[in-house]
């Protein structure tokens, strides 16, 4: 704290002394929350105390060509991620017409980020920034050279499951990154190109078992294994009068050291790892915007890993996975609607090919329309086969074309339609926003087993099981501007989910390839319904007050929530005594007050639902808080 005071005083005096060319700004965010966290394990109704304290201070100052940015954090603990007390981020930058140098904590990307994308999202405890130096030189008007070198030490969270605390970062990585980018602007009129190479020398956590020097298998919590990758690539960008074109292609070569010492499952089975692995990625987009129409087409094709399910599912940390600094475009819509945010598409950056098309149409000054379509799948699928010749293992199946997606459930297909209607009704000064989305996706697992039967010659037993989620969501938002200067916003959202479980068991005659008999052929569908409502009254730059209501027809863990009156908050007690059935219902009240034009005080009391929270395709489970009291203060000066 003493250091912070001295730094703030120094920067303030600096800004006074050199007011003609100096600048200084700061932003403070302080959060406190307390409540209870319910267990997410099936059949467990335990509630544990949940408290978080997060305080961050961003300071930016500069003089002439020099600037400095720092971030202080005092969290013990934060809502998600590790504790931190003191200086967390620091970056110094000097820039001229021909040279710029940044040292410290670095953010930025090459191209669209397929090989290098340095960014941070504290809400999901994601940090792929580098601590090092970024040098940019411009020898002439067209050529730019970027040299980047530093260390990345971001962390990852395990998928939610038994024994996993979602608030704690499970693994941290230690990677040394060296990168070079050569870009040429207007090599031809309106045409720019870039060539790059990114080298990552990392120590990655391995979670499982390992063989010691005596040949015995011993359990370890986490072992760091060295990997090294090199990713060369290029991009081309063209700007037309009313259209843009962009194409980026790269490849990755990965080497895993000491593969023979790795043991990955508790059974007596070795999982073989190739010492070297090669993959590639590509992204293209076309934008067309003639007048009131905007059209964007995107294509992604990421194929870095085709590991079989033992490696994909039994190892929470696959050694062959992408480095955190590699984060290309998602090419699907990331929604702002509350319920749709809880059921996102979980993208596989290592094996996914797909498209996205979006149309924006400004029909008039009062009417604006959006239409979006996205579809994708993996390149590879697997069958678990057991042949009478002795082979027992995984059989890989590829799509008909590595350049296009498939509808076959084996390849985990995803499909979504989305439409949005925005209209301003002038006589009532009413803004209307209507949304609709329909999506379908294979979730959890796809299993296909083929057994050759020794007791029934020339026949196989084939078993198929998959789980598919179908979602239909209708969000609506109405905002009414009142004569008094107040604004009244009503938001509600309905979502219907069909959770489908397919079971299929047949016997096939190999000589004719025909099915002899069908033992089981059924799809078990479990329907769910969700509802979210929020009402808010506000006066711009003064205050706001609101009420939220959340409902689920069923809980996938099997245990209904909010059924015990002994656990009621005072708000829930009032509602229950008024005759409201509180089963699987959550309520909250919220308010905000502008203490000054730049300082906002927010308070919430009630229950906050947890779930997957995603940013740029990276998803982390953030737990909810029941009977919560949270306070947030935000100030800029």
Q: Where are the language model's segments positioned?
A:
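Conserved radical SAM core fold
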Residues: 109-111, 154, 202, 439
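Flexible, glycine/proline-enriched loop segments at strand-loop-helix junctions
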Residues: 120-122, 162-172, 181, 220-223
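Beta-barrel outer-membrane channel/assembly domains of diderm bacteria
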Residues: 19-108, 114-117, 129-149, 166, ...
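Generic multipass alpha-helical transmembrane bundles of integral membrane proteins
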Residues: 205-209, 221-223
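Sec-dependent N-terminal signal peptides
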Residues: 3-16
